[in-house]
Amino acid sequence: MNPAFSIATFNLFNFVEPPLAYYDAENIYDATQWQRKCDWTRDRLIEMAPDIIGFQEVFSAAPLAALCEAQGLSHWALAPGQEEQDFIRRKPRVALASRYPIVETATVQPNPELVKALGLAQPFHFSRQPLKARLHVPGFSDVRVIVVHLKSPRAAWQPGERPLIADEELDQRVATPVLGRWASALQRSAEAAMLCLDLMNEQLRDPLPSVILGDFNGDLGSDLLTLLQGGEEDAYRLQDAHDLALYQGDRDPTHYWGANGSVLDHILLSAQFNAGFGQSLAQVDEVVVWDRHLRFNDAEQDRMASDHAPVLARISVRI
C-alpha cells in the first residue's frame, strides 16, 4: 500500500485562555467554559486525526500547542506577531501543527511592485499574517504549506468612525455597511493576489508540492478569490482539494449565517496532487467536512464549539 497522509484546516473560533478576553471585556470564558472548549477542540483532533493541520483564530498558542502535542502533532509553528499587552485580545494568529518535521518557517511578504501596480496604500499589511512552512513528509517529499485567514466580509470601519456623507444616520445605516464591506472585499482580494504571486515565486525558485489552506472568508468561485486557482500553466495552478478528490460527495458548507450555508474554508493544492497532471506525485482520495456541530444546534455548546467546520483532505502518495 502506498504511503498516505492527511491535511486539515480548522478555524477554532476565539481560542483564548481566561482571564484574557477576545475583542470585548465581557468576552471571557469562565474556567468551566474554557475546559469545555479545550475538550471540544481535542475531540475534533482525535476524530480527524490529521497529520498536518492549520489553525485560525488562535489567541492563546501554548494551550493549543499542548492539545496538539497530546495527539502526536508535536511539530508546531505560530505566525509571527507582536505580543498584545492588553487583556482584551484583538489580533488572532494562524498556526500550524504536524506529525512531520517542520524544516523551516517564513512569512509571506507583500511584493512592493505588486502593491504599486494594484494602487494599494504602502506599506501593505495582511489583516492576519499568513504562515509559510516547509515540512518533510517521510516517503513522499518536502511540502510547502501556507496557512491563511483572509480579511473577513465585515465592514472595515465602525459606524461613525469614517463619515463619508453629510447625513449621519444615512452614513451609519447605508454608507458604512455597503462601502465598509466593499473595502474589506478589496483587502481580501489584495491578500489573495499577494499569496498568488508569493507562491509563484516560490515554485519558480524551488518547485515543491504546495498547499494553501485556511479560512478564505469567501467562495473560491468569486471574482475576488478565483485568481488563486488561476493560470494556464499547470505547474503553477492551485486546485481545490474537493475538485481533485477521487470520491466526491456533496459540497457541504463550512459556515452558516442563519440558515444560509457558505464554503469559506478551503484546502488548495498544487499540480503535484492532481492525479491527472503528468508529473503528479500524489492524489486526493477524499475530502471530509466535520460539520455535525453546525447541523445539529446545541445552544449550550455553540459558544464552546466553532462557528466553522474543519475540513480534512486524505492524500495517497503515487510514487
Predicted regions and their residues:
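Short, solvent-exposed loop/turn elements at domain surfaces
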Residues: F15-L20, R154-A156, G276-F277
